[in-house]
UniProtKB/Swiss-Prot annotation:
Tissue specificity note: Ubiquitous. Expressed at low levels throughout embryogenesis and in larvae.
Annotated source species: Drosophila melanogaster
Compositional bias per record (Basic residues), positions renumbered to this chain: 295-311
Function: Regulator of Notch signaling, a signaling pathway involved in cell-cell communications that regulates a broad spectrum of cell-fate determinations. Mainly acts as a positive regulator of Notch, but it may also act as a negative regulator, depending on the developmental and cell context. Mediates the antineural activity of Notch. May function as a ubiquitin ligase protein in the Notch pathway. Regulates the sorting and degradation of N/Notch via an ESCRT-III dependent endolysosomal pathway.
Intervals of motif SH3-binding: 480-484
Domain comment, as recorded: The WWE domains are thought to mediate some protein-protein interaction, and are frequently found in ubiquitin ligases.
Zinc fingers (RING-type) by residue: 548-603
Compartments where found: Cytoplasm; Endosome, Multivesicular body
Protein name per UniProt: Protein deltex
Consequence of substituting residue 571 to A: Loss of function. Abolishes homomultimerization
PANTHER family noted in UniProt: DELTEX-RELATED
Length: 738
């Protein structure tokens, strides 16, 4: 978001930017009034402020959204964006009119005004997890000029990415954009033969979390369920109601929405249905011939064999047959044939109802006829969906065998095809502290997981996380139910299922005990270094109960979000809250993992600061410090030169000033003094002793200042009996230990 408002002013075109400002197609977020206060309830959502760019809504950066959200809560009118992002120095937002305006007024042109809106997204969305999807404005080989996607498009891309899909066709989603995303090489291709551009998934700070009113929470929940059932894309978002939009003077032609695409598909399907009527009549004639053949075979069989009573488990009703035929669309190669499949299935089931009624007293003929009908329907479906035509109609016996084998193996085939087609879920660099049970993995859906505590993804694709279990895949793509089996086969199948369920329950209980009992253990050296400071504990009960210091919710022990304590300070908090704080603390220039207690500020792990480049040297001088007679003195010299601030400093690109350097400090030459010197060297190497900010003495900005470690710069500052112990404690609080 280095130049979000600037791109809006220049009219940059954003592929995959979502629906236009005039018609936001099937969006799933809530917008609020510009003058209203913040929502108040126990339901939470992530608040994202967005601006209009050539008919598309793009998100501000998390820092700008946080700045605007604070101004919105205080009911301010005019908010300068440069306070949060220096690159937006000429822009401000009018919170009452929900517009962004520019202070750079030119003669005869007036102010440049664009629309602004305030949106709510689920905490499990990319905005809440601190991830961001961007596309390159240059060619596929270019690595600069990265531009963010529309937030709704980011939700869909993140959903496909989390499922481990290789490609994502945005035409088949509810937004209906002509783009295909390739997750294997991280590229975006415009259909049918447009340019190819690079994409990337980066980490950023999460957007601010707010509370919703009961009406907004109910609407968020209802719209999430409806959109999820209709599109099977990322749910958990609300409905969109844009309250204020400034008309744009120049707009692109809006991209086709999902409703227009569905109309085109419906017209194409209607033409195909007329062509298939003749083919379906031919299939009915073949069905009648197969029925006569089965009736003759059954009469011969009953003349030579004793008659048996009909079995209830082998009967297949018309409704069950229709359900089986409708579920055969898993073999389809294109989503455009789903409506044709439903029509053919209904016609086949209706034509078979008369023959089923006629042969109701003959169970064997009834069962064979049902299998033949299923085989014919599958052949008819394959003739419509496959690229090449199949061979001519086989005999009824071969068709029945193929139908039985396909039906019984459909469960494993579908999952194996999915698992073979799945690429490993490349969630960049994700490490885990505890093992999670399968029940919690299925129940969390897209919510923030306990395993995300050490999620420090920075856009790298080198580390792979385990794929989702087949059970979760089966929930998204149900397989067709198999035909009734022999009682012995049914008993064997039930016994196998019971044994499998018992094994899964035992494994889940063992994993749950391992994840809760004792210290949390990671899976790589980095997580082991930080997880040894975290331990799962039982929170105190009422009246000694205490809230989490970050979310202010009551600490209640649960497997999904257990209560943890830090080793040295013993402060309690939620594991998911600690996870969110660690993700927010991550920096692209800093890959070290550390925990900083939100209550007392004690650091666990190796924290790296933003100290400017400099040098530290020391020497022994033969002079006694007051209170340390008979001991030499350690003289420490810090030297830092003035320069320019980088991205890790408060004002990147602005000059900073090293005032009063070189600075000379003193320590007594004793065992504890030498240990303090060693810890000071470690802290200096981790860039923790100095920072850039406002001077306490002069009040000047952008100068090098001391951090929280005391130094003695004069001999007359001694004696101080507790100085060395106090300095050691301050260094330990910064994470500097043996």
């Amino acid at each position: 978001m280095a130049s979000s408002a600037g791109s809006a002013a220049s009219g940059s075109v954003v592929p995959g930017g979502g629906g236009s400002a005039a018609s936001s197609c099937a969006t799933m977020a809530l917008s609020t009034a510009g003058s209203g206060g913040p929502p108040v309830n126990h339901a939470h959502a992530v608040c994202v402020w967005e601006f209009e760019s050539r008919g598309k809504w793009l998100p501000y950066s998390p820092a700008v959204s946080q700045h605007l959200e604070r101004a919105h809560a205080k009911k301010l009118t005019r908010v300068m964006l440069s306070d949060a992002d220096p690159s937006l120095e000429q822009y401000y937002v009018n919170v009452r009119t929900m517009t962004q305006e520019s202070e750079a007024e030119t003669a005869g042109s007036g102010l440049l005004t664009i629309g602004v809106r305030r949106m709510f997204y689920a905490p499990s969305s990319p905005a809440g997890k601190g991830t961001k999807w961007e596309w390159s404005g240059g060619s596929a080989d270019s690595n600069n000029d990265w531009r963010p996607y529309n937030m709704h498009v980011q939700c869909i891309i993140e959903d496909a990415w989390a499922r481990g899909e290789q490609t994502l066709d945005l035409c088949n989603t509810h937004i209906g954009l002509p783009y295909t995303i390739n997750f294997c090489n991280l590229t975006q291709l415009r259909q049918p033969s447009g340019p190819m551009r690079s994409i990337r998934r980066t980490q950023q700070a999460p957007y601010p979390l707010v509370k919703l009113t009961p009406q907004q929470a109910n609407q968020l929940k209802s719209n999430s369920a409806s959109v999820s059932s209709q599109y099977n894309t990322l749910p958990k978002l609300g409905d969109t109601k844009s309250l204020h939009r400034v008309p744009m003077t120049r707009q692109q032609h809006p991209l086709p929405t999902s409703h227009q695409v569905q109309q085109q598909q419906h017209q194409h399907q209607h033409q195909q249905q007329q062509q298939q009527q003749h083919h379906h009549q031919h299939q009915q004639q073949q069905h009648q011939q197969q029925q006569q053949h089965q009736m003759q075979h059954h009469q011969i069989h009953h003349q030579t064999a004793p008659r048996k009573p009909p079995k209830k488990h082998s009967e297949i009703s018309t409704t069950n047959l229709r359900q089986i035929l409708n579920n055969l669309n898993i073999f389809s190669s294109s989503t455009k044939h789903q409506s044709n499949m439903s029509t053919a299935a209904s016609a086949s089931s209706s034509s078979s109802s008369a023959s089923l009624h006629h042969a109701n007293h003959l169970s064997h003929a009834h069962f064979s006829h049902a299998k033949n009908m299923l085989t014919a329907s599958m052949n008819s479906h394959h003739s419509r969906c496959s690229e090449g035509s199949l061979q001519s109609q086989r005999s009824s016996r071969m068709g029945s065998h193929r139908s039985r084998s396909r039906t019984r193996t459909s469960d494993t085939d579908t999952n194996s095809v999915k698992s073979h087609r799945r690429r490993p879920s490349v969630d960049t660099v994700s490490t885990y502290l505890s093992h999670e049970s399968k029940e919690s993995l299925r129940s969390r859906n897209f919510a923030i997981s306990v395993n995300d505590l050490l999620d420090c993804s920075l856009g790298s694709d080198e580390v792979f996380v385990p794929s989702l279990p087949p059970s979760s895949l089966g929930e998204r793509a149900p397989v067709p139910p198999p035909l009734p089996l022999h009682p012995r086969q049914q008993q064997q199948q039930q016994q196998q299922q019971q044994q499998l369920q018992m094994q899964q329950q035992q494994q889940a209980q063992q994993q749950q005990q391992q994840s809760i009992a004792g210290s949390i253990v990671g899976v790589d050296p980095a997580s082991d270094m930080i997880s040894r400071f975290v331990k799962v504990v039982e929170p105190p009960l009422w009246p000694n109960a205490q809230p989490c210091p970050m979310c202010m919710e009551e600490l209640v022990h649960s497997a999904q979000n257990p209560a943890i304590s830090l080793s040295r300070c013993q402060h309690l908090m939620h594991l998911q809250c600690l996870n969110g704080m660690i993700i927010a603390q991550q920096n692209e220039m800093n890959k070290n993992l550390f925990i900083e207690c939100p209550v007392c500020g004690i650091v666990y792990g190796e924290k790296v600061g933003n100290q400017p480049i400099g040098s530290m040297s020391w020497s022994i001088i033969s002079k006694n410090l007051p209170g340390h007679e008979g001991q030499n003195t350690i003289q420490i010299v810090y030297d830092i030169a003035s320069g320019l601030q980088t991205e890790e400093h408060p004002h990147p690109g602005r000059a900073f000033f090293a005032v009063g350097f070189p600075r000379i400090c003193y320590l007594p030459d004793c065992p504890l003094g030498r240990k303090v010197l060693r810890f000071l060297k470690i802290a200096f190497d981790r860039r923790l002793l100095f920072s850039i900010g406002r001077s306490v003495t002069t009040g000047r900005e952008d100068v090098v200042i001391w951090n929280s470690v005391d130094h003695k710069t004069q001999f007359n500052m001694f004696p101080d009996p507790t100085y060395l112990q106090r300095t050691m404690q301050q260094l330990v609080h910064l994470g500097v230990t043996d």
